[in-house]
Amino acid sequence: MSELRDKLQSLLARQGLMSGAEWRRKTEELAQRRASGEFEIDRVVSGEVVGDANAGFFLVRTEFPLDTAHGNVTLGEALLALPEHVALSANDADLRDFAPETAIFLDTETTGLAGGSGTVAFLVGAGYFDGAVFRLEQAFMRDFDDEEPMLRYLDGLFTGRDAVVTYNGKSFDIPLLRTRFIQNRMPFRLDAA
């Protein structure tokens, strides 16, 4: 019998698998670590809770001076982009009046890629020019009841924005955010941008 047990242990080790007892021990250890708060975002990332104790999202704010370089280009150089060049490169005549200083740059991380009413944007990154800096704000839902205060905050960021810049926002990010705003009975300002 011990020969069979030794073979099983060897096979488990070779495949990187755990025995039932090891699995149970690791699961209990992980549960204790979670209960201690070790994995709470505020212990890993500098930021603040916005809202109240019952429903407040986690916000990380970062400012980048306009002389911050990305490759060979500084952030400030984006403000020099000619609208007609932007429209031509995007093959979109509607961008002939594009002004980076009034745009909001968005990206979302979601609970799934299917879209629809069950998909939630648990992390929304929003960047915008503000005087001599480019501000990046990352709003993170720690739980589902954080969504409404996070959307209210984002609504304030969207106010006064003339354009939205995203990677795949027209087909994913914007429809997803629109759905979340509607489900929370809030107007979606980006439809006008």
What kind of feature is each model-predicted range?
Residues A114-A132, L136-R142:
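RNase H-like nuclease fold core
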Residues H70-N72, A114-T119, L176-L177:
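Short, conserved acidic/polar surface loops in the N-terminal third of protein domains
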Residues T110, L123, V164:
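Short glycine/serine/threonine-biased micro-segments
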Residues G131-A193:
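Conserved DEDDh/DEDDy metal-dependent 3′-5′ exonuclease domain
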Residues M1-A99:
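N-terminal accessory regions of nucleic-acid-interacting proteins
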Residues T102-G112:
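Two-metal-ion RNase H-like nuclease active-site motif
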Residues A99-P100, G118-V120, F158-D162:
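Short, well-ordered loop/turn elements at secondary-structure boundaries
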